[in-house]
Amino acid sequence: MSKGTSSMGKRQKRTHAKCRRCGSVSFNVHTKQCTSCGFGKTSRIRAYKWQAKCKY
């Protein structure tokens, strides 16, 4: 039940792969969803207003 250095050696599986839609390496293999574009979760491209800087 250790959570330190000895358990870090067991982390060797791939969590994210290359996305089919956006091409970035942010497609979660376990949940089958892309965290960058939202592929697998929604048909629209994932985009938020807070991603762009404000133009003052």
Curated annotation (Swiss-Prot):
Gene Ontology CC annotations of this record: cytosolic large ribosomal subunit
Co-factor(s): Zn(2+)
One GO MF term attached to the UniProt entry: rRNA binding
Gene3D superfamilies: 2.20.25.30
Cofactor binding annotation: Binds 1 zinc ion per subunit.
Single biological process term from Gene Ontology: translation
Alphabetically ordered keywords of this record: Metal-binding, Ribonucleoprotein, Ribosomal protein, RNA-binding, rRNA-binding, Zinc, Zinc-finger
Membrane-traversing stretches: none
Zn finger intervals (C4-type): 19-37
Binding residues annotated for Zn(2+), in chain numbering: C19, C22, C34, C37
Recorded family membership: Belongs to the eukaryotic ribosomal protein eL37 family.
Cited function: Binds to the 23S rRNA.
PANTHER family: 60S RIBOSOMAL PROTEIN L37, RIBOSOMAL PROTEIN L37
Name of this protein: Large ribosomal subunit protein eL37
Organism listed in the record: Methanosarcina barkeri (strain Fusaro / DSM 804)
Gene: rpl37e
